[in-house]
Amino acid sequence: MCTSTATPPVWLSRKYPEVLLKSEDGTVQDHGARQHASFASPVYRKLAYRMIEELARHYGKDSRIIGWQLDNEPTVQFDYNQAAEEAFREFLK
């Protein structure tokens, strides 16, 4: 079983635009590309954890589930959205 944490659903991208990656030139990635969410976003992390918890509650005892992938093809992307910049500034202190 997999979660959609690598590519959040379109409703999440539209309702919470602050979860989207932002490039150095200020371009915000939109839904339609893979891995467009910012792991630095507290909103994204909260919603991802909630989704994982709900799936675990629903499928946790299902004997047909033999494995669970929480993310798919994690990658490193440069991220300049507000949450990433704030976290980096805090790290530098």
Model regions and ranges:
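Active-site mouth of glycoside hydrolases
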Residues: 1-93
